[in-house]
Amino acid sequence: MIRIVHVNDEVLAPLRARYGSPVDLEWSGEISEREHALATYNPDRTHDVTLFILDPVDRIALIRKPHFALGIWRPPGGGIKPGEDFALGAEREALEETGLRARLERYLVATHASFVFESQTLAWQTHVFSARTSDTVLAPHDTDEIAGARWGTLPELAGPLRERLLATGHALWRYRVALHDAALRALRE
């Protein structure tokens, strides 16, 4: 399968100039058949953007998708469409998944991952940004994809939510934990 990468250095260079240089993270792990199906459901997509959206009192927006196990929440995010301005696409994803109007602040983490399933290796990128909103009401627009949204705290993401993700035993949740850990470290710097 040939996968087109439209989030490339040409797209990312202006983001680094505007939002700062991110921490680079490499990650590799074996994924299950179910995780492979999730990672390849859109064969043209090879990336996601994850948003650490903070409100005026530094709460973080968290979302839950219908297929998440009970108690699993994570920061929102999604894909940038081919030809779409990256920052506008990230803001669109924030609105769709949380109902929040958010503005990007910092480019926290750029991850290059290899998801291994049987004899296949799937290359994936995740770009993590912090964003700010003055909105306080969470109301997801895309209710087919998002089962719920709520406010959490950074210590909650680093503690109980992290432990729940790891307890699933799933590689893609371990990947999310690595992203969250790197982003939380970058936010403290």
Which role does the model predict for each range below?
Residues 5-10, 43-51, 84-88, 114-117, ...:
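Short, mixed-charge, low-aromatic patches
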Residues 80-103, 111-166:
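Unchanged
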Residues 3-10, 18, 30-31, 57-63, ...:
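Short low-complexity stretches enriched in small and charged residues
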Residues 29-75, 102, 106:
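N-terminal strand-loop-strand
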Residues 51-52, 129-136, 182-189:
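A short, hydrophobic secondary-structure junction motif
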Residues 21-24, 67-77, 92-96:
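Short N-terminal helix-initiation segments at or just after the protein's N-terminus
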Residues 1-7, 70-71, 143-189:
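Nudix hydrolase/Nudix homology domain
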Residues 2-50:
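Acidic, metal-coordinating catalytic segment for phosphate/diphosphate chemistry
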